[in-house]
Amino acid sequence: ASSLSQLRRRRQVVLSYFEDMHVEVSEASHDTPYLFQSLLYGQPLENKTRTWTHYVTPRGFAELMPFTNTASGNHIGWHIGRVDNWTGRWESIEKAQEASKNMVLFNATVGNKEGIAGKLTKNPHILITGATGEGKSFLAELIFLLTSLQDVKCLYVDPKRSIRKHFEAIAHHPDFEKRFPLLAKHIKQINFVTLDSKVKSNHGALDPIVMLDKDDAVSVSKNMLNYLIFSNKRIKVTMKQMTAISRAINKVVAQRQAGETVGLKHVLQELTNNPDSTIFEVGDYLTSIVENSILELAFSDGNVEGLSYDKRVTVLEVADLSLPDKDNQQDVTPEDKEINSTALMFALGAFCTRFGELNRYEDTIEFFDEAWVLMKSAEGRAVIQSMRRVGRFFNNVLCLITQSVHDAEGDDDTTGFGTLFAFREDNELPDILEHVGLTDNEENLEWIKNMISGQCLYKDVYGNLNMISIYNIFDSIDPLLKPMKATVSSNLEN
């Protein structure tokens, strides 16, 4: 308009026009442009904004969730899933993922780092628990693959032998090589090691006297031999025999430190060469159970290289490993193969410990699957404890994958775990709540009962606790994490 009076007339024409059409038009005031900024959540009210005050019911205000935090995970990291804020039960993990916009990022190497604002723990270790089929191996392998792309030295101990065959088949598939050439190259560069006692060149690869320093070699050797003896309840061992075993181990380890080519087999020879018949008997018994068994992987004459610590990414598996059932009763005598396999796990644990403490200035991480096998015995718990104590000082992360939240407990457990992933285990729901620091009440029990396969409780290094839906967003990694192929029957089921 050319004048104020003309502007007012035109304004009235517009209002009358819309009024005739029964359309309500609101007139703006001079401060309307600032309305949006003034009504932003948390914006302080000024004198000019008092007429814009919004009234809200307590229920409506509570839905805004003031002073609460639903963040989970690290600020920078790899996507491993999304937070699930619903207390109900989802039909599928995909629907839970689609319903959330709150991403969970994870970086396994920052747990022990200094100067990170808000971090409540400097404990770098990770514990993944849950029943079979709930998703703990999926999560562990996802974290392993993503972390292997960083400048981190990685070791995955796979007693189930589930990774190598599947990874290599996928990486060498022509279609995968064409679509994802860089990842295929990365998988092919992983140092896959399968220790098979039937292959003579593997004998002694896990010999503790060969691969460990003096104190650890003595400790692990004693643990292995003691376990082999005491697991057979038909054998009565005297103090004289136990003393002879300890002296033989100390002698052979001292010879190794002096530069002689000796190994754990020489300990057995020391016992069988003893003129005392009772000491000869225990040496002869140990020699008999080692011969032509999986234990040959840990017994050598010292003329072996042992496992390499130099490869950046290693997957270590042991052929013919027969692990005992976790639900076996303590008074049930395990089979010989189970006893031998468990004794060998002590050597595997010692290798992991040594792997993590070689270079304190290098980030390292070990994934130890089926860790409950070690936690069933006092000797095994000591091995796990030594692996955990490497921790912060050596920039080492230990990730234990096991079935029960009780598997990592111990009377002398002071090192704990800084990061917890607890998948559903129906027989331990109250224990899971206690494990993550929640009250055991009906509301919380109902909440975790609604967890589906692929969901878990996640407690991060900042102390945040949420239910999250584990989900992989990388098309290239997806085939590596899904070893079970769909069938006609499974497709028809949907």
Set out the residue ranges of the language-model regions.
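Conserved P-loop NTPase motor cores
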Residues: 110-134, 138-144, 155-164, 170-171, ...
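P-loop NTPase motor domains
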Residues: 58-104, 110, 161, 169-173, ...
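Basic- and hydrophobic-enriched, low-structure N-terminal and domain-boundary segments
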Residues: 1-124, 473-475, 492
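C-terminal regions of RecA-like/P-loop NTPase motor modules
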Residues: 31-58, 62-79, 131-132, 408-494
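Conserved SF1/SF2 helicase motif Ia
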Residues: 150-152
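Flexible glycine/proline-rich, aromatic-decorated loop/lid segments
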Residues: 177-202
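Short, glycine/acidic-rich hinge or "gate" loops at secondary-structure transitions
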Residues: 24-36, 164-166, 260-263, 361-364, ...
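Anion (oxyanion) recognition and catalysis
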Residues: 19, 148, 392
